[in-house]
Regions:
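Conserved beta-strand signature within the Rossmann-like core of class I S-adenosyl-L-methionine
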Residues: 130-137
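Core SAM-dependent methyltransferase catalytic element
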Residues: 174-190
């Protein structure tokens, strides 16, 4: 059995540095909320891959930490950060067996990765007034990607239930059968 880290390292070893910073639309649409954050102005990018979200948040003035199982992907992220003129911290972690680093975090984000065991840690790791940004595939993705593992898709209403202690800023929770991702932007009450 090939480990997740080996599989992702192999994938990223065949990749080259992205020609441009790819900004997650959920972050971009909440840029004003991000820019208005108070201290500690720290960000945690979970399952960061090549760190585009961490680099974007660093460019917005946050101290960004990127976590991923792939040292190769994080290495590409460090190159991206350098090219974009910012510094990020990268940490190689197997997220399936590791607890998230303690906060408090001003921003926690995670895109295209699902480990439901992390949801309580994500909510608890936010600083008062901190922001959560999360997007991944939902059950409607299985119509197009029939080989995709159904354990790794969100069910309708799941994000609203899992993050009920947070104030929802925007939410698409699997109700639209034409939308194959679900997302949430939420704030921890101050």
């Amino acid at each position: 059995v090939v480990s997740d880290a080996s599989r992702w390292n192999e994938k990223y070893a065949a990749a080259s540095l992205a020609s441009a910073l790819r900004v997650e639309p959920l972050l971009e649409s909440h840029q004003r909320d991000i820019d208005g954050l108070l201290a500690p102005r720290t960000a945690l990018d979970i399952a960061a891959g090549t760190c585009h979200a961490a680099v974007y948040l660093a460019k917005r003035g946050l101290h960004a930490t990127a976590l991923d199982c792939s040292a190769v992907g994080l290495g590409l992220g460090e190159q991206l950060a350098k090219r974009e003129g910012v510094a990020i911290k990268t940490t190689t972690k197997d997220l399936t067996v590791t607890k998230l680093p303690g906060g408090p975090w001003s921003v926690i984000c995670c895109f295209r990765y699902l480990d439901r065991n992390l949801f309580p840690q994500m909510a608890a790791g936010l600083a008062p007034g901190g922001l959560l940004f999360y997007r991944t595939f939902n059950v409607h993705h299985l119509k197009k990607a029939t080989a995709f593992n159904p354990e790794y898709v969100l069910q309708p209403g799941e994000l609203n239930r899992e993050f009920s202690t947070l104030e929802i800023l925007s939410l698409s929770d699997g109700d639209d059968p034409e939308e194959n991702t679900s997302w949430i932007a939420a704030r921890r009450p101050a």
